[in-house]
Amino acid sequence: MMTLTFASPPQNKSDLETGPAFTPRFDEKGLITAVVTDAGDGALLMVAHMNAEALALTLETGVAHYYSRSRRRLWKKGESSGNVQAVREIRTDCDQDAIWLKVSVAGHDATCHTGRRSCFYRTVGVDEGQAKLVITDDERHFDLKQVYAES
């Protein structure tokens, strides 16, 4: 249960950018963007969204929680796969409308639901005038059918 609450962002830009208060600026849907990297090697793992409850639970428990826009519900990362994200550090950007989580991933060391370490396993390029995707990391860290059989 969430006990932590967040004050409204200050009107003064200087206070927002240099003051000591963490006052996240949630968007009109009540969400803030979360960029997630590996605390050890800095690899980009995923981008997700948090509502106030997910952010508070993350701060209170030290385990990453997010808000699923497609499922419209709170979820603890790794609750199905076992790839729980232990939060090592949280940073916010200058105007507090995005956060950066540095995490250690338990389980299979995979963040993506496809079984890959990162959700960013494809590059975007142009081939014969068409935008194309190229898979650059096809290593699966777990068997999807086995891990998600009960989900």
Swiss-Prot record:
InterPro entries reported in the protein's UniProt record: PRA-CH, PRib_AMP_CycHydrolase_dom, PRib_AMP_CycHydrolase_sf
PANTHER family attached to this UniProt entry: HISTIDINE BIOSYNTHESIS BIFUNCTIONAL PROTEIN (PTHR42945), HISTIDINE BIOSYNTHESIS BIFUNCTIONAL PROTEIN HIS7 (PTHR42945:SF1)
Compartmental location: Cytoplasm
The protein, known as: Phosphoribosyl-AMP cyclohydrolase
Keyword Endoplasmic reticulum tagged: no
EC code(s) of this entry: 3.5.4.19
Single annotated GO MF: zinc ion binding
Pfam annotation, one family: PRA-CH
SUPFAM superfamilies per record: HisI-like
Protein purpose: Catalyzes the hydrolysis of the adenine ring of phosphoribosyl-AMP.
Residues bound to Zn(2+): C94, C112, C119
Polar residues composition-biased segments: 1-13
Main location as per UniProt: cytoplasm
CC annotations in GO: cytoplasm
Subunit record text: Homodimer.
Binding locations of Mg(2+): D93, D95, D97
Source species, domain of life: Bacteria
